[in-house]
Amino acid sequence: MTDVPVSHIRNFSIIAHIDHGKSTLADRLLQLTGTVDPREMKEQFLDNMELERERGITIKLQAARMTYTSRDGETYILNLIDTPGHVDFSYEVSRSLAACEGALLVVDASQGVEAQTLANVYLALEHNLEIIPVLNKIDLPGAEPDRVKAEIEEIIGLDCSQAVLASAKEGIGIEEILESIVHLVPPPRDTVDQPLRALIFDSYYDAYRGVIVYFRVMDGIVRRGDRIRLMASGKEYEIDELGVLAPNQKPVESLHAGEVGYLAAAIKAVGDARVGDTITLAHNPAKEPLPGYTEAKPMVFCGLFPTDADQFEDLREALEKLKLNDASLHYEPETSSAMGFGFRCGFLGLLHMEIIQERLEREYNLDLIITAPSVVYRVTTVKGEVLMIDNPSLLPEPQYREKIEEPYVQLEMITPETYVGTLMELAQSRRGIFKDMRYLTQGRTTLVYEMPLAEIVTDFFDEMKSRSRGYASMEYHLIGYRANDLVKLDILINNDPVDSLAAIVHRDKAYHVGRALVSKLKDLIPRHQFKIPIQAAIGSRVIASESIPALRKDVLAKCYGGDVTRKRKLLEKQKAGKKRMKAIGRVDVPQEAFMAVLRLKNE
């Protein structure tokens, strides 16, 4: 396998917005190069997680090695490193781009450039990749290749004279794409004689072999049986198995600079082989690790609690297993007076949170309660200490804090002109600060806003899609923290604060949110045998309250006529019982109530 000269290797990835046909295009490339046996071929071959196929999105990274004989008669090795297209996974995208020399920019010829495409293109340009524009879905009646070419040239500034017109579904233009990869993407640098440096761009956990690491050799050569060191963690391992991904694993003896492959070395947890880390040899280590390794920081936090307290250990195990595959998932145990024991989890964004939650419920059969997502606030205390708070119930009391700062993002929305008004209204209602508006070709507009992340985190994306009938797309990145007049809104049920319902909101919105919350909870919490007051409070001031009336048993059913004092005695007895119950009774808050809080924040 290693007799292929470096000049005949091409490493590329595919950049695209969700649903622009990236996975289908990857399928066609695998088919045309004969990489996958026609009998094994299925739609979206590389998306092999059930959830990915169902949602039609790529979540985990995949890689495949293809052999292609070009029209010039030479045989080339093409390594495709598939990238996820969603904004939450941009750290995965940046790693896989670092392992490539070129990228196919796939744009839907009927829709044009979308916000997410832009975000990934800028990442690719930062890594100095050769970008080949591909206009996909040209078989659609609504395709306008010339308009889209002009749009790519105008927005991204790429020369589109070389753009390939293709239809992955119909198999049109696939060979042209392969030819342009061979001729336009530069080969890797020939650095076989240097000390080994390889970039880890993905890893997953295999129950039998431990962690399987996907990597790209940047310098040097790696052989089976070598003792390797991971530069960020400093740990050492011996390689048991080394191979290439074609796309199924195929063992080989050695891999040299420029090649992409996998290794197994009895590594116990994915946390030991962090994505973006550098592999080097233990006896002849490289001086410097490869640049660009950062740990993905969670942006969104929420509490996960099992509905059945006995499942706590199962939940811990499930999270540990997911953590093996997903180094960006953070979790730590927490207790809540209303929900018992559970975990505080950190995610990259909302989609990431939904996927983890769905996988826990699906693959591990857990029944979960999820609290409202919150972002990380920066609180400066009176003493001048700076605290990072990811859980509203941990916020210090007002007299101890100097200021609260919240994360702000720059948000870019690309939308047809018709929906500009309604989207601007949406952004303003979410405390957005208008920054810029640019007109693109053919009646499309870019809107740029600065906005608190907390306002995007719940349902901004859904709201934007429904207001623009699905045509708008968005992309955001963090720009820093800013101080705001934020307060902690407590919800008291039966005079007890429920920590998992607490939220940090802007003072101007507090009354409105509190009012809406208590009335929603009134509808959702079932009636008990005693009266339940529900209150929303800021500090000690109650700003809204509702109460759920008690259920009453008809204690007078068996009194026909007779003395009124007899009836009064029974009613008094019932009243005393209710009073006692109220003092010691627990209110069961159903999962719907917590979910309502999620949805309500911005209604």
Swiss-Prot record:
It is an enzyme of class 3 (hydrolase). Gene3D superfamilies: 3.30.70.240, Elongation factor 4, C-terminal domain, Elongation Factor G (Translational Gtpase), domain 3, P-loop containing nucleotide triphosphate hydrolases, Translation factors. PROSITE patterns: G_TR_1 (PS00301), G_TR_2 (PS51722). It is a peripheral membrane protein. One of its GO terms (molecular function) is GTP binding. GTP binds at D19, H20, G21, K22, S23, T24, N136, K137, I138, D139. It catalyses: GTP + H2O = GDP + phosphate + H(+). Residues 7-189 form the tr-type G domain. It is found in: Cell inner membrane. NCBIfam families: lepA (TIGR01393), small_GTP (TIGR00231). HAMAP family: GUFP, LepA. This is Elongation factor 4.
